Amino acid sequence: MINSAVNLLVNPQDYYIKSESREDLPQINLFKLVGNLGYHAMMLEVHLTPKPGLVDLCTNGAHDDMDIHTFENSAQAINPFLIKFLYAGLNHSDTPIDSLLPKLRPVGLNAEEAMFQATSGINTHKGMIFSLGIVCGVIGWLRGNNLSFDAMHISKAVKCCCHDLVFKELRQNHDKPKTYGEFLYKEHGLTGARGEAASGLATVMDHGLPAFEKTVKEGFSTEQALWQSLLVLMANNLDTNLVSRGGMEGLLYAQQAAQGLLVKGGCRYTNLESELTELDEIFTEKKLSPGGSADLLAITWLLAQMNELSPKYV
């Protein structure tokens, strides 16, 4: 069940600003709207219920240190920074896209600080800040260059922006890994969120987004489309969150469990909710949390909105 307070049908006119500022009002309106949609993406992900091993409206999943309120507080703290990512991209749109990432990092660090302050030190959305920050920054850059900001253009721009991220942050420290992400790369070749960004959000573009848009086009609800997309993402994503908690065996188990529900019909399966609830109990017992796929689910929904929004502004 998705919280009804999360309004999916955002009207751009709701963000009209009356101002004597010389700034481009349509630009301000657009960035406020995109930032708002980024916030909605975070809220939709956490409110989707049930989910296996993840915090939702009914359970804390495999997490002992956080609940739905922790996530809501975190999302609210991050929200103001999304428009800052957008303007960081816009303000550096006269520079090559492959030089954008360092300009986004300060905003990301400030967003992380706000998140930790809101959650008393609990990491709820660090991966989400990374992914949403890059996507929003790229949208700002594309807008500054009068380019479309649909999913395809965002994907290509993210790939150019982050093309050497794996080399700079994972391969260079291959022999002496300093972080757990570097260790997972050395031991298993897993690149996590960095690899997803460097690939141009390939898992989202190849799996999550097509599943979401196809399901919506077939007449299913947003909630059902989100379930379908989450299962497709879980079945295909090399989720380092799962590996950190359950090793490669945990990742394989989660992938097979998601694939099993897809074989039964996914969102078309009449017992999906009850089986997701049962799977949540199993994941919780095994301490498995597909947090990487949860982040990609939010990105999937946001890119679907950009496909609808971009033609109205370009």
UniProtKB/Swiss-Prot annotation:
InterPro entries: CitG (IPR002736), TriPribosyl-deP-CoA_syn_CitG (IPR017551). It catalyses: 3'-dephospho-CoA + ATP = 2'-(5''-triphospho-alpha-D-ribosyl)-3'-dephospho-CoA + adenine. Gene3D superfamilies: Triphosphoribosyl-dephospho-CoA protein (1.10.4200.10). GO terms for molecular function: ATP binding; triphosphoribosyl-dephospho-CoA synthase activity. Keywords: ATP-binding, Nucleotide-binding, Transferase. It is an enzyme of class 2 (transferase). Its EC number is 2.4.2.52. Pfam families: CitG (PF01874). GO terms for biological process: prosthetic group biosynthetic process. Belongs to the CitG/MdcB family. This is Probable 2-(5''-triphosphoribosyl)-3'-dephosphocoenzyme-A synthase. It comes from Photobacterium profundum (strain SS9). The gene is citG.
